[in-house]
Each structure stands twice: as C-alpha cells, then as structure tokens.
Amino acid sequence: MKVVQINTTYGVGSTGRICVEISQMLNAKNIENYILYTQGEGDCTLGIKFAGSIYKKIQALKSRIFGNGGFNSNFATKRLLNELDRIQPDIVHIHNIHGHDCNLSMLFRYLKKKQIKIFWTFHDCWAFTANCPHFMMEKCEQWKIVCEHCPQIRRTSWFFDRSRTLYNRKKKLISGLDLTIITPSQWLADCVKESFLKDYPVRVIYNGIDLNVFKAIRSDFRTQNHITVDKKVILGVAFGWGKRKGLDVFVELSKCLPEQYQIVLVGTDSTVDKQLPNSIISIHRTQNQQELAKIYSAADVFVNPTREEVFGLVNIEALACGTPGITFRSGGSPECYDETCGSVVDCDDIDALEKEIIYVCETRPYTKEACIRKAKEFDKNTRYKEYIELYERINVAGTERG
C-alpha cells in the first residue's frame, strides 16, 4: 500500500503537524508514504514540495482579481500530478488544499480517471461552500442549497462575486469521486450531512496531541512574568488572533474582571499588541511546544471564546496540562469538554463568561486529574492510528459503503 497526503503546509500549523504525525505512524508500520506540500519549515525529509511562496502569492493575487479561487495554480498542480504519476499511490489523503497552490479541476479529474481511493479530512468548511472556510459569524446557510451573493466575498475577491459558479463547479467535480470524508468533530460531520456531500461516507476522527509534550509540569512562567501567587491566570491561546478567535472578548473581560485576575494571551504579534490594554500580558507566537506546556500548566483556567471553530485543539492541550477550560457554544469546540473538566457558555455572552471564570477560579470544581483523564482520550497515537486502520480496511475491502 502506498499513501500520499496532500496539504498546504508541512510540519507547521495544526494540519502540517497532523500530516507529519500520520506519516510517522505509517513509517513505523513500513508503509510507503509521501507528503506533497507547498510551505514547510525544518526537516522536510518526508515531504515533496510542489510550489514555492512567490508562486503562491501570484496565484493568490489572480484569485483576488478574478474571483476564481481554487481554479488557478495550473503549473503547481501539474507538478503535483507528475509526482502522483511517479509514486502511483493506492490512497490519496487530502487535507487543506485552499492555499492558492492547487487547481481543483485538474486534481479531481486526474483522481477520477485513475480511480484512486481518496480520503479527505475537512479541517474547515471550505470543501462544501463556494470559497468560505467558515460561515458561522455571518450566520450564512446558503451552502445547504447553493452559494450566491456571498456576504464574505471581499475576503476572497476584490471585483467579482463568482460564488454560485464556484459552488456549482466544486459540486460537479467532487461528484463521482471514490471518497471517504473525515471530520475532526461531530459538529462538522453534521454540517457535511446537510451539504451537497451528504451521500458520501463520513467518519469522525478527533485531532490528537502529544501527551509526552503537553502534560502538567513545574512552571516558572508566573515568576518570569511577575505574576504574584494571589492572582488567577486566565489564559487564551490562538494562532491568528482576531474577532473570530475572540480577541475583543478578552479586551472586554479585562475591563470587568476583578484586579486579582490576570489575562495572558499567547500567539500574538506586534499588530495584536496595539489592540490590547496594558493589563493583558502578551506572549508572541512560538513553535516551542514545551514552553507552551509550561504556560498551560501555570494557568488557573483556559478560556477559548472562539466564534468559529471546527474542533479546538488548544482546549485539549490545556486539559493535558491539568488546566480546565471554558468555551463558547460554537462549532466543535464544546466537544472537547464534559462535566468533569470544563464548561460552555453561549456565544458572545460576556456576562455569563465572566461569571463562569470567577466560579471556576474560586470554587475549583474541576480537578487536575479529571482534566488529564479527559485529555487522554485525544492521545495522538490513538487518534491517528484510526487513520491507519481506515486506510488498511479500505485498501483491503475496496470502496467503503455508508
């Protein structure tokens, strides 16, 4: 069995790390596998790069001008298809392919012609919309019937609204693929069943974390940042702070929480810093997971006021470090918690969120042991083993039904 994964990134970001971790598990079973990617850092010995950053910027500009995202990048896609011809995979596992590096028409026609078994992990909602990875903040449900007059069009196109055309092209191209869809949350699986992809088999495989890295450890974070022992640390972590991730919520919380509550945000940058009051501690983005585990371990409660989230891996990372969480009732984020380790409040209900933060910090209803126990359900070795088992089952049985 030969497996090829296709993703925009290699080793960076959540999807890039997931690809590498799946590849490592395949290597451990002596299964030949490759990762085709366009952006990566560090040792990319497991991967094959098929487009560069300058090329991608040109394709992004073309998409903005002509409003045809997903249908440019002919040269890069030709290189990708040449690699597939060379490798002759039994399985192609698609992750994110909306980074201005892949032409859907060329890729899907090739896969249909070659009758290759496809797994597609949806890390967002882009596959069944015209061109939107998320739609919750807009409260848009056009994707259930047909996308048109897109309320988010300026995010992807400067001049033309081709949402109806893109939606119909995508629907036609995906039809007839030998496809199994994988989602990292039940919420997203439910969305798929309301989309034009409803007749395809869908499997939920939650994302996993490395429990050897994310664990409760002794931390000097408070000392380094001059946080006194009497203060409660309210932690937020995101990589791409903005309204979608709830940056404005933390600004509001800083105004209403008592003085003994210290908000810490991780994953910021100089632009985000300008939007924050001096009372919030800002930690710029880091790829050092050990340092991140120390910060999680130092917090009293992890708060994720996300408004659009497919799953919420940061929730699990915090739990693994013994820190309970609170999240908005949005997307798949609530699926990370149960009554033993965290709580959920309605989206945008700042008053309820403030009260829940104070309740969790003052009464400590969730033990460190319960949080860690919940996190063990998301051990990457267990979760990504499900992918390998699915590959092997499909490879033996042929096309999975239902």
Which stretches of residues belong to each language-model region?
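Conserved donor-binding/catalytic core segment of Leloir-type glycosyltransferases
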Residues: 182, 227-245, 251-255
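Acidic anion/phosphate-binding donor-loop and adjacent secondary structure
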Residues: 190-193, 209-224, 274-275
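Nucleotide-activated donor-binding/catalytic signature segment of Leloir-type glycosyltransferases, i.e.
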Residues: 267-290
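Short alpha-helical donor nucleotide-sugar binding micro-motif in glycosyltransferases
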Residues: 294-299
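Aromatic "clamp/platform" in nucleotide-sugar-dependent glycosyltransferases that forms part
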Residues: 307
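Short hydrophobic beta-strand element within catalytic cores of glycosyltransferases
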Residues: 324-327
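Conserved acidic donor-binding segment of nucleotide-sugar-dependent glycosyltransferases
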Residues: 339, 343-350, 359-364
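A charged, aromatic-enriched C-terminal amphipathic alpha-helix characteristic of glycosyltransferases
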Residues: 365-395
